[in-house]
Amino acid sequence: MAWNSFATPLIGKAVRAASRLAHGGGSAFPGKIVERIDPQFLARTLQQLPLGVVLVSGTNGKTTTTRMVASMLESLGLKVFTNPTGSNFTRGVVSSLLAEVSLGGKLDADIAVLELDEAYAVHFVKQVQPDYCLLLNVMRDQLDRFGEIDNTAKLLSKAAEATTGTVVLNREDPRIARLADVTHTEDGVEVRYFGLDKSLRSFFPSDDDMCTTVDTESAADTEASVGIDLSESAESDENIEIGDASAIAKTGEHAEKSENAESAEQLPADVTLLAVGDHRASFGIDGETYETGVKLEGVYNLYNAAAALAA
């Protein structure tokens, strides 16, 4: 066994202890140091796990969904390693590993459930191919980081492509659902979907749905402030100007979003959120309906629960 199999945990734990004394809490700094001195530590340690690695990523809901998946697996009697306090960058995962491994580099766990930032998921899968991958959504929350929303989807596609076992996708998010195209189903990779009952879709708008709402409200505001009925000007091809061309483009976008909704209907969801109530929810799983109490606050966390159940 290489010397760093013993030296890295010792050095990393020492740095972690010093960092906790200095800052009084969890820190990704020890992970950064270990990545420098032993780039193979992450892959070497996670390869010990008999049941492999579950990767969870997406714009929103990563932390809650990761905790739910880990909790479900623990309820089955499995020992689960996760990154609850570290950052969701690769160095955060390494820092969390340093807290769990023995001085000999042994990780006492059956499976890992890891939350990864969209950008760092790409770096992670270059080192460790996940056995399972759960991709939640792509939203415009972080355009300052990724520029275009499609860039975020491209980052997540790398995680889906690298997965060797099962990829779980959000049926309601067209950018996520399309990632089935990059999975290696010819090599036995399974694709599963979680989704919403049609009656609930208005309560869980996708990024495209929210943009549609903004566009509609903007058009209404323009119509009211300028005093022009935009629907009348759209009836005459002779009156088309630059502003009308933009409106026509938006009409095409809305038609595409309608097609996306129809496509979602056609995809078979392995887990469907059927109904929500006061701390209760109904899920459709493999054709059966299950109603359960839910302690989590927030309606979106019920949809995250559907994602966790599908994993």
What are these regions (language model features)?
Residues 35-40, 95, 113-117, 150-151, ...:
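Short gly/ser/thr-rich secondary-structure transition/capping motifs
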Residues 104-212, 293-295:
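Flexible active-site lid/hinge loop adjacent to a nucleotide/diphosphate
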Residues 61:
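Conserved glycine(s) of the Walker
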Residues 188-311:
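Adenine nucleotide phosphate-binding catalytic loops in nucleotide-utilizing enzymes
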Residues 64-82:
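A conserved segment at the C-terminal end of the G1
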Residues 68, 92-95, 306-310:
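Short amphipathic alpha-helical face segments that pack within enzyme cores
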Residues 1-57, 72-76, 90-101:
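Short, basic phosphate-binding NTP loop
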Residues 82-89:
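Active-site nucleophile and cofactor-binding loops and adjacent substrate-binding regions
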